[in-house]
Regions:
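N-terminal chloroplast transit peptides
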Residues: 1-29
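Absolute N-terminal positional cue centered near the fourth residue
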Residues: 3-4, 49-51
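Intrinsically disordered, low-complexity proline-rich segments enriched in Ser/Thr
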Residues: 23-26, 33-35, 59
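PEST-like intrinsically disordered low-complexity regions enriched in serine, proline, threonine
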Residues: 47-48, 57
């Protein structure tokens, strides 16, 4: 020990033992381990809080940052001092609870085919708390199973899984694993006894302010309103439905929901006619009708807003309330499937009517009544009553089914979706401010699902994928038995059908880099036509809830900016140039397919080589496929960029992706709207038109079911704020959600 340390020890020992002998003894032990002056100064300052004011150094250093952070975290839960509210219950969120599939065993996959139609026996958040998960949670809480006290069961009784995600990244020597996010309700005293403290990425205290709680004051004050404002909502997709439900449940407004398409029961018949008779109903199809385009799609509920945010949680809980499987609250990449959406939408419709809302199906808005910069309502074309169409009107609230009808309202919400091109054209004529924005176009790529399982999980785990559909599972099992020839490791755990996500911002088109990415990946799905007009062909992907088909499909698209040179030939259409470009490509696809809704296809290997396929593999597209030169359908820069992305990026990200059995289908043009309605960031009203509220994907403020639903809620809150306060300007900021919602690509 050097001289400085010895002197300091002597001084501190005298003072320390006079005030607090145990602390002084601890200080002595630390000082004996280091003689460096800087370390000595920092270590001495650690205990300065136990000294009197006179004994504290005048120029106090900040001390060890890590130690101070720990002290700060402890203060947050009352460690080291008397708790003010020891019985107050707080929610702790635990991240990174890891469990391996083999530990879960074959019971991991829940038999979705045995779920009752009313959703009464779907898995709950509690059902995911299996013994391996509990063991991993106890380890995080630093509680050994054999040391569990009588108080432990009560702690676990309030635990619930809020998210489960599969990490199947193939690292050397690493198996797939599930990571859980678990919430636990604990009193402050219990948290202190366990020594819990917030840690970034591991533990946090939740501030549980959910979106549904923001309407309380409005709902309470709604009874005082004399005449309820009538709010016309155009479009019954996620944005329109959630907006209508929010307005109706508040009791403040009467929502009048107009939908050009049909209720899900009748809409299914229209889709059947398209598949079997190749006849496109321009008002009732895969894109238009109750629930929007997402109804006949995969029903993905992923979003970039953040799965753990209150608004997203509220949307998911609302879907469960109306019949969605409870597992969507937990799974890291949840999806509903078309079969679940039909029941859910029917329940949502019935509830909306019970709350006082109106719904008019077969009602297409054709004119927006704007006077003196303010919208007064809409004119709509209604389905005529005759023997052929009478069945379509059984679910409509319209008492008189004229050919045209005017719906007046105090405000109008536009939630029309990105495929309602006639709406953009009508708004443009009416003087509503529109602005072009970037979008993406490309194809649907389809692989046999067993090959995606192999690429993502490897030979050892690919054979452990089970969908509960015997024919599909047999194909997958035989594929991996042939590959391994008995050499694969034996596993008890099971895995879901594999999916993927690919992206690059360096897709070189010959002159510049573009973005290219996969979009709306549908494992165990099928490809369907999503055209809304005769003489055009565009496609989409969909899956049922079981995801048990033999194929996996995804969009492969490349970006187009609003000032892209490839749009120059369409500039005469002004801000609608992107729409005309989409239409042009869809007409070409229709012609390449033989003008009968057959889809033009090309092997992926032939596409990158610029050659027409001499033969094609089987496809999930039910209207037939024909070999065609898809490499010629888009302008050369887009072909170059996508080919470069496939060969130089996607194949390297997923070795085996570029194979002969991969089949491109044309075309995927409607990933998002090429237009955005200008919207005031504070009032959320359309630029230049009072009381007109654009929302959802069609308005350019969302991308996907969840983000569209959240945006619909945000707009509903802005409307309620305006009519509650009587403020003509309104204020969406009162609800802390006035910004545009992020996209999920």
């Amino acid at each position: 020990m050097n001289l400085i340390a010895a002197v300091s020890l002597l001084i501190c020992s005298v003072r320390g033992f006079q005030q607090n002998p145990p602390i002084a003894s601890t200080r002595r032990l630390i000082l004996q381990t280091s003689s460096h002056p800087r370390i000595l100064t920092q270590q001495t300052s650690l205990f300065s809080s136990t000294q009197t004011n006179d004994s504290k150094p005048k120029n106090k250093r900040r001390g060890n940052k890590q130690f101070n952070n720990k002290k700060k975290r402890k203060r947050e839960v009352g460690v080291g001092k008397e708790l003010k509210n020891p019985d107050e219950v707080i929610t702790w969120r635990c991240f990174g609870i890891t469990v391996y599939p083999d530990d879960l065993g074959p019971s991991l996959n829940i038999d979705k085919r045995k779920e009752k139609r009313d959703g009464s026996n779907v898995p709950s958040e509690r059902s995911y708390l299996t013994p391996p998960v509990i063991s991993s949670l106890l380890s995080r809480l630093r509680i050994k199973s054999e040391e569990a006290t009588d108080g432990l069961p009560s702690i676990l009784q309030d635990a619930r899984v809020v998210r489960r995600s599969l990490d199947a990244r193939r690292r050397k020597g690493s198996d797939p694993k599930y990571t859980y996010v678990i919430d636990i309700d604990l009193t402050r005293q219990a948290a202190r006894n366990l020594g819990l403290a917030p840690q970034s990425g591991k533990m946090e205290i939740l501030d549980d302010k959910k979106l549904k709680g923001q309407d309380d004051d409005i709902a309470n004050n709604a009874e005082d309103s004399q005449a309820k404002p009538r709010i016309v909502i155009v479009g019954a997709g996620p944005a329109g439905l959630f907006c209508a439900l929010s307005l109706a449940s508040s009791g403040l407004c009467t929502p009048i929901l107009l939908e050009r398409g049909q209720p899900v029961e009748t809409r299914g018949k229209s889709i059947g006619a398209l598949i079997h008779r190749r006849c496109v109903d321009p008002e009732s199809n895969f894109s238009f009708g109750e629930g929007g385009a997402g109804t006949w799609s995969d029903g993905k509920l992923t979003t970039r807003i953040g799965r753990n945010s209150g608004s997203v949680r509220y949307v998911l809980e609302t879907l469960v309330k109306y019949g969605a499987p409870e597992r969507i609250l937990v799974e890291g990449a949840p999806h509903l499937g078309t079969d679940n959406l039909v029941r859910l939408l029917r329940n949502m419709r019935e509830d909306l009517r019970e709350l006082g809302g109106e719904i008019h199906f077969g009602t297409k808005a054709t004119k927006y009544l704007i006077e003196d910069g303010k919208i007064r309502g809409v004119e709509a074309e209604c389905v005529e009553v005759n023997e052929r169409t009478k069945s379509k009107l059984i679910d409509s609230d319209a008492r008189e089914h004229e050919s045209f009808k005017t719906f007046y309202g105090d405000a109008v919400v536009l939630a029309t979706g990105h495929s309602a091109r006639d709406v953009y054209e009508e708004l443009h004529k009416a003087g509503v401010e529109l602005e072009p924005k970037g979008f993406a176009v490309g194809f649907r790529i389809e692989h046999p699902q067993r090959l995606i399982n192999e690429i993502q999980y490897g030979n050892d785990w690919g054979g452990r994928v089970f969908t509960k559909r015997p024919s599909t599972d047999t194909v997958n099992t035989e594929h991996f038995e042939k590959l391994s020839e008995g050499t694969a490791e034996s596993h008890q755990g099971t895995l879901p059908v594999a999916s993927y996500r690919l992206a690059t911002d360096k897709a070189f088109d010959g002159e510049q880099n573009r973005g290219a990415y996969s979009f709306c990946m549908c494992p165990g799905g099928q490809i369907v036509p999503s055209s809304t007009e005769e003489g055009e062909l565009c496609i989409n992907g969909m899956s049922f809830s079981n995801r048990d088909s033999l194929w996996a499909n995804s969009a492969l698209v490349v970006t187009v900016s609003q000032d892209d040179p490839i749009l120059d030939k369409y500039r005469s259409h002004g801000c609608l140039a992107g729409l005309e470009f989409q239409r042009d490509i869809e007409r070409k696809a229709y012609e390449l397919g033989g003008m009968n809704m057959t889809v033009p296809v090309q092997r992926l290997t032939d596409y990158v080589n610029g050659e027409v396929s001499s033969s094609i593999p089987a496809s999930s597209y039910r209207l037939g496929a024909i070999s065609a030169p898809l490499h010629e359908i888009y302008p050369k820069p887009l072909y170059n960029a996508l080919s470069y992305a496939i060969t130089e990026h996607f194949e390297k990200q997923m070795p085996g992706f570029l194979i002969e059995d991969a089949l491109l289908h044309g075309v995927e043009t409607r990933t998002s709207s090429p237009l955005r309605l200008v919207r005031n960031r504070t009032t959320l009203q359309a630029g230049g038109v009072d009381n007109l509220y654009p929302t959802g994907e069609g308005a350019g403020f969302a991308g996907g079911i969840v983000s569209a639903a959240v945006d619909g809620l945000v707009v509903a809150n802005a409307i309620k704020a305006k009519f509650l306060t009587g403020d003509g300007d309104g204020d969406g900021n009162a609800f802390k959600s006035s910004k545009s919602i992020g996209f999920d690509y």
